Every structure is written in C-alpha cells, then in structure tokens.
C-alpha cells in the first residue's frame, strides 16, 4: 500500500542522511 511505499522511501532517506552525516 501507499503507507508501505512511504515508509520504505522514508527509511532509505533516513539511511542516506545518516550515512552522509556519519562520513
């Protein structure tokens, strides 16, 4: 559903930001 897609996108976004901040 839409919520699952949103959660997946948000999760990858958070991971990307976390990786950017950590490096």
Swiss-Prot record:
Keywords: Amidation, Amphibian defense peptide, Antibiotic, Antimicrobial, Immunity, Innate immunity, Membrane, Secreted, Target cell membrane, Target membrane. Coiled coil: none annotated. Expressed by the skin glands. It is found in: Secreted; Target cell membrane. The keyword Endoplasmic reticulum does not apply. The modification Serine amide is found at residue 23. Changing residue 4 to K: Increase in growth-inhibitory potency against Gram-negative bacteria and decrease in hemolytic activity. No change in growth-inhibitory potency against Gram-positive bacteria. The keyword Secreted applies. One of its GO terms (biological process) is defense response to bacterium. GO terms for cellular component: extracellular region; membrane; other organism cell membrane. Its main location: secreted. Antibacterial peptide with amphipathic alpha-helical structure that shows selective growth-inhibitory activity against Gram-negative bacteria but low hemolytic activity against human erythrocytes (LC(50)=145-220 uM). It is moderately active against the Gram-negative bacteria E.coli (MIC=25 uM), K.pneumoniae (MIC=50 uM), P.aeruginosa (MIC=25 uM), A.baumannii (MIC=6 uM), and is weaky active against the Gram-positive S.aureus (MIC=100-250 uM). Belongs to the frog skin active peptide (FSAP) family. Alyteserin-1 subfamily. This is Alyteserin-1c. It comes from Alytes obstetricans (Common midwife toad). The lineage of its organism: Eukaryota, Metazoa, Chordata, Craniata, Vertebrata.
């Amino acid at each position: 559903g839409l919520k699952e897609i949103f959660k997946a996108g948000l999760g990858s976004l958070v991971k990307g930001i976390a990786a950017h901040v950590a490096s």
